[in-house]
Amino acid sequence: MKKLLNISYAILICLFCTGTSTAQNAKAEKKAEKTAELKRIVEGKNYVFKANSANPTGNSSVQVSGSSMQAGNLASMMGGGSIALTGTYDLTLSNDTLTAFLPYYGVAYTAPLNPTEGGIKFKTTKFDYKVTEKKKGNIEISFKPLDLQQRAPGDVQRMIMTVSAGGYANLQITLLNRQPISFTGTLEEVKPKPAS
């Protein structure tokens, strides 16, 4: 009887290890598929980053909708410095055209002449584009606008987007005359519109 019990335990342990191994293999295969899909989307240069929240880096005061607020008040009001965005704010790469329509929260060292040009808004076809594979299936995409006429309104020096295999992304923007800002959101493929 004791021998039968030991054999049963050994069989159960083998089954458990095999089941765990199979589950790990399935999980690894699924992650590899997601990574391959993400790589295909990024290399196709036809996608949109949809921003869900903005993360200003200022520590003294932050300009919000025309009124100056202390960063501590903003952080407590907005939940730790992250500002949830409503509406459609995005960065789109489509047909070799880079288009940005993002808000800006933070300290500006020079003010725009037109108060409606306070966000990060531009459209350009002249930019450097570099894709780097990182650990754990993440991909880093670097954008650098080259056209000074296009860069001047938004004063964008460089943008770095880190995208996970699941499509979640973090966009960090370095600006010439303003403090840096980052955004979190998702990366989605832009489907081509059917010809009519």
Question: What residues fall within each predicted segment?
Answer:
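Sec-dependent signal peptide cleavage junction
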Residues: 19-59, 68-70, 196
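N-terminal post-signal-peptidase region of extra-cytosolic proteins
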Residues: 33-35, 69-87
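Helix-rich interaction surfaces within compact, conserved domain-sized segments
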Residues: 29-44, 127-196
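Surface-exposed, interaction-prone regions used to assemble/regulate multi-protein complexes
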Residues: 62-72, 87, 113, 194
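Mid-length scaffold segments of soluble, non-membrane domains
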Residues: 80-135
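Structural motif
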Residues: 46, 97-99, 168
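Bacterial Sec-dependent N-terminal signal peptides
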Residues: 1-29
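Generic short beta-strand segments
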Residues: 50-57, 103-104, 144-146
